[in-house]
Swiss-Prot record:
Keywords on record: Endoplasmic reticulum, Ion transport, Membrane, Transmembrane, Transmembrane helix, Transport, Zinc, Zinc transport
Organism, scientific name: Schizosaccharomyces pombe (strain 972 / ATCC 24843)
InterPro entries: ZIP
Gene Ontology BP annotations: intracellular zinc ion homeostasis; zinc ion export from vacuole; zinc ion transmembrane transport
Recorded superkingdom: Eukaryota
Name recorded for this polypeptide: Probable zinc transporter zip2
Similarity field: Belongs to the ZIP transporter (TC 2.A.5) family.
GO cellular component, one term: endoplasmic reticulum membrane
This protein's encoding gene: zip2
Chief localization: endoplasmic reticulum
TM regions (residue ranges): 6-26, 48-68, 88-108, 267-289, 305-325, 329-349, 368-388
Length: 389
């Protein structure tokens, strides 16, 4: 069997993923084109929500309408199987694949969560320093303004930066407002585990020098949710990248197998679009975490270039092993693998990608996510109708 088509398509779709990773440069190109800032990927979740939700819709429809259909076509070719047996084996493989993938995803999340708690991820990855413009905007108070906090001795990452100044005094001797927050010195400001908090406004009862610059500081709400969000941006970026790259292994498997049948066009188109989105989805959280476009792009391109071809290699080895048996055995093997992979795709869509989109969606009733999710399904349906004609 000639497998060159499978390798060409797999590598081509992988190139789409690398192309998608370059999307983190999109705002620079757009802003340069217009001559002023119209797009800021670093401070907007809209692009990420759009990509994730649309990708989830494409995968959901593809898993059920395309991959499961391919599974049925293979299994119905087996002479000893009637339609009932075909459906039994197909749905058993479908649910088995979904359960295995769900368990795998559960333990992966658990391991990553424990790693973030023990500092494993922070010890093995570093965060780039803020850009000069960011550092300029985050000016620290004058040296005369000391930070006094009852939480300072706790030693936790957040308590080194954020604290309540209850009953504290500034150098001028003026009593500060209870609950005011001050930024620690500049060395803590660039720490990878720091949370930036600033005094919201200049205290009305103090006119000393140390409060003269507070009006220019960025402000944060200081709520526990905001602090937790800022503190977990780095870990979230690593988790998202690792999860999606590990999920791309079965995608490479699907792409390679789909290339062997004439009716695989729908899956290939869906996977091509999906990989453009996923390339951006891998690179974007890393860019948010590292604040470095080249580092995020190279990391995303490297991870995707390893994971998808690995799935294709596994499919190639399975096909070579199955080729030595009977045609019924080969059809059974392909049918079971396609059905199991469809179950994995369903869990990937509904359990991993869509919830991630909802988590970043701040629109009313998560409307943005559900609109993009529906568009993904309708777009895939349109491509299938177009392909059938």
């Amino acid at each position: 069997m000639n497998n060159s088509k499978g390798w060409i398509l797999s590598l081509s779709i992988n190139a789409f993923c690398v192309f998608g990773a370059s999307g983190i440069y999109l705002d620079k190109l757009v802003n340069k084109w217009f001559g002023y800032e119209v797009l800021d990927l670093a401070n907007s979740d809209n692009a990420l929500v759009t990509g994730l939700a649309t990708s989830s819709g494409i995968l959901l429809y593809s898993s059920w309408a395309s991959v499961m259909q391919e599974s049925f076509h293979f299994l119905e070719k087996i002479s000893m199987f009637d339609t009932f047996l075909v459906r039994v084996f197909q749905f058993c493989a479908f649910f088995f694949g979904g359960i295995v993938f769900y368990i795998f995803n559960h333990f992966l999340h658990k391991w990553l969560h424990e790693s973030s708690q023990t500092g494993f991820l922070h010890d093995h990855f570093s965060v780039s320093d803020p850009s000069p413009s960011t550092a300029q905007n985050h000016r620290s108070p004058p040296a005369s303004c000391k930070r006094l906090s009852s939480c300072e001795s706790s030693g936790s990452p957040s308590s080194r930066v954020v604290g309540s100044l209850q009953g504290s005094y500034c150098p001028s001797g003026t009593h500060l407002h209870e609950g005011s927050l001050l930024l620690e010195d500049s060395s803590a400001r660039h720490s990878s585990d720091s949370v930036h908090e600033y005094l919201v406004k200049k205290p009305s009862n103090c006119d000393c020098e140390c409060h003269a610059h507070f009006s220019s500081f960025p402000t944060h709400s200081g709520t526990p949710d905001d602090i937790e969000h800022i503190h977990s941006v780095y870990t979230m970026g690593i988790q998202t990248a690792l999860l999606i790259c590990l999920h791309k292994v079965p995608e490479g498997f699907i792409t390679f197998l789909a290339s062997t049948v004439d009716t695989g066009f729908m899956v290939l188109v869906a996977m091509s679009i999906h990989n453009i989105v996923e390339g951006f989805t891998i690179a974007y959280p890393l860019y948010l975490a590292w604040k470095s476009r080249p580092k995020a792009f190279l990391t995303a391109a490297t991870l995707s270039s390893c994971s998808l071809p690995l799935g294709s290699l596994i499919a190639f080895l399975v096909m070579e092993a199955g080729g030595i048996g009977s045609s019924d055995f080969l059809n059974f093997l392909y049918g079971i693998i396609f059905a199991g992979t469809a179950g994995m795709m369903l869990i990937l869509s509904l359990r991993v990608i869509l919830p991630e989109a909802l988590r970043h969606d701040h629109s009313e009733n998560k409307r943005h996510s559900f609109i993009c999710f529906t568009i993904g399904i309708l777009f895939t349906l349109f491509l299938e109708i177009f392909d059938s004609h």
